Regions:
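Acyl-donor (CoA/ACP) binding surface of acyl/acetyltransferases
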Residues: 1-10, 25, 38-161
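Active-site rim helix/loop that mediates acceptor-substrate recognition in acyltransferases
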Residues: 16-35
């Protein structure tokens, strides 16, 4: 899948066998260090669809938890990426107690942007430190940090009491 030019259209190039092995090794390290990473996506009939999961990425020099996904070309457009990304978002929020989640997307990748938007991520900023010249960062606050005080609703603050 990572060697397929249509799947890797928005990457600098498809991955070679060696690059794919390095990517697998990176995923193994993620599991060792964090306890999570990318998961395999399969149909109910156990047909391989792609991968989706959570990894730490640098966005403009700061660490961000990213939901990422790859789907085999012939399986694209069927909702698999959206379903898997939503499950990852929920895992990040409910299990990892993550406060913020991002998706880092090539500006021309409209399908990936749609997936991000369908799971509640909105454009936040451009990242100029990635492997492409510019990457679009979509994100969402999953929960509020406990250190942030609750805000008073506007009408309550201006009652004149």
């Amino acid at each position: 899948m990572l060697a397929d030019p249509s799947v890797m259209e928005f990457y600098p190039s498809p991955k070679s066998r060696e690059e794919s092995q390095a990517w697998i090794d990176w995923n193994k390290r993620n599991y060792s260090e964090h306890g999570y990473g990318l998961w395999i996506i399969e149909t109910k009939a156990a047909e391989f669809v792609g991968d989706c999961g959570l990894t730490w990425q640098a966005v403009n020099g700061r660490p961000e938890l990213e939901v990422g996904y790859h789907v085999r070309a012939e399986m694209q457009g069927r909702g698999y990426a959206t379903e898997a990304a939503a499950a990852c978002r929920d895992f990040a929020r409910d299990v990892l107690q993550a406060v913020h989640l991002v998706a880092i997307i090539h500006p021309d990748n409209t399908a990936s942007r749609r997936v991000a938007q369908k799971i509640g991520l909105e454009f936040e900023e451009d990242d100029r430190a990635g492997m492409n010249d510019v990457r679009s960062v979509y994100g969402a606050r999953l929960r509020y940090a406990q250190a942030v005080p609750l805000c008073v609703r506007d009408e309550e603050a201006h009652r004149g009491e």
